[in-house]
């Protein structure tokens, strides 16, 4: 590959990195722990903590992903 091609590739990669939106994976998790698993059918209510309102966390219980108020353990 020519030096011009390498510079173009480097420029495109840099631009892609700058323009890539911040994903939820880069955000810190919310404080607290998820409460015990609820007894209910499978439901996918959320994808991550930031898809839940307020202080609620996206809690995964196998086939259940739902927004729940966190519990805090000392």
Swiss-Prot record:
GO terms for molecular function: serine-type endopeptidase inhibitor activity. InterPro entries: Elafin-like_sf (IPR036645), WAP_dom (IPR008197), WAP_four-disulfide_core (IPR050514). It is found in: Secreted. Residues 27-71 form the WAP domain. Expressed by the venom gland. GO terms for biological process: antibacterial humoral response; innate immune response; venom-mediated disruption of cell wall in another organism. Residues 1-24 form the signal peptide. Disulfide bonds join 34-59, 42-63, 46-58, 52-67. Keywords: Antibiotic, Antimicrobial, Disulfide bond, Secreted, Signal. GO terms for cellular component: extracellular region; extracellular space. It comes from the Eukaryota. Belongs to the venom waprin family. Damages membranes of susceptible bacteria. Has no hemolytic activity. Not toxic to mice. Does not inhibit the proteinases elastase and cathepsin G. This is Porwaprin-a. It comes from Pseudechis porphyriacus (Red-bellied black snake).
């Amino acid at each position: 590959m020519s030096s011009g091609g390498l510079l173009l590739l480097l420029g495109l990669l840099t631009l892609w990195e700058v323009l890539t939106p911040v994903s939820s994976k880069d955000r810190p998790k919310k404080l607290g722990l998820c409460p015990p698993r609820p007894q209910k059918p499978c439901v996918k209510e959320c994808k991550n903590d930031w898809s839940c309102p307020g202080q609620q966390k996206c809690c995964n219980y196998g086939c259940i992903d739902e927004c729940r108020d966190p519990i805090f353990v000392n």
